[in-house]
From Swiss-Prot:
UniProt name for this protein: Protein YrdA
Pfam families attached to this UniProt entry: Hexapep
PANTHER family linked to this entry: DYNACTIN SUBUNIT P25, PROTEIN YRDA
GO cellular component terms, semicolon-separated: cytosol; protein-containing complex
Family: Belongs to the gamma-class carbonic anhydrase family.
MF GO annotations: identical protein binding; zinc ion binding
Organism: Escherichia coli (strain K12)
């Protein structure tokens, strides 16, 4: 196991095909990365006290931190962190014990707290705060601290969610092809 991929107790990261994890990032414990995931520079993903699951073609951009919530008498089930497919997580985002659907864009510098649920086809503007246990309904732009539903997404914006994820897969493949990064 490399310095990038680290066990926690008897929990080891599980990595799909064509995954890129930048050498400056760290993935610890029960973390499950599906095919074509891109983990960019300076990302921390800790699946130590619960699991982290990241769906296919999702990208986690530079400086983001992903963690989970442990099981306790206060929260008997804890909160894993689950991220769907074709998701773009912008630079310096913090995700903690939340659930993100498919085709979501989480804007740069946003914070999503324990128990938050983001349905499919959602755009979260940069610098937003999604409070604990808040649900963001499918098909809308959300913005603010705390987030507010701003307006429905246009068809072009919805198509842009998938475009963003596909574009990052292309860039990830270019990095892998030129040898700047290696697959773990």
């Amino acid at each position: 196991m490399s310095d990038v991929l680290r066990p926690y107790r008897d929990l080891f990261p599980q990595i799909g095909q064509r995954v890129m994890i930048d050498d400056s990032s760290v993935v610890i414990g029960d973390v499950r990365l599906a095919d074509d995931v891109g983990i960019w520079p300076l990302v921390v993903i800790r699946g130590d006290v619960h699991y982290v699951q990241i769906g296919a073609r999702t990208n986690i951009q530079d400086g983001s931190m992903l963690h989970v919530t442990h099981k306790s008498s206060y929260n008997p089930d804890g909160n894993p962190l689950t991220i769907g497919e074709d998701v773009t997580v912008g630079h310096k985002v913090m995700l903690h014990g939340c659930t993100i659907g498919n085709r979501v864009l989480v804007g740069m510098g946003s914070i999503l707290l324990d128990g938050a649920i983001v349905e499919d086809d959602v755009m979260i503007g940069a610098g937003s705060l999604v409070p604990q246990n808040k649900r963001l309904e499918s098909g809308y732009l959300y913005l603010g601290s705390p987030v507010k539903q701003i307006r429905p997404l246009s068809d072009e914006e919805k198509a842009g969610l998938r475009y963003s994820a596909n574009n990052y897969v292309k860039w990830k493949d270019e990095y892998l092809d030129q040898g700047n990064q290696t697959q773990p």
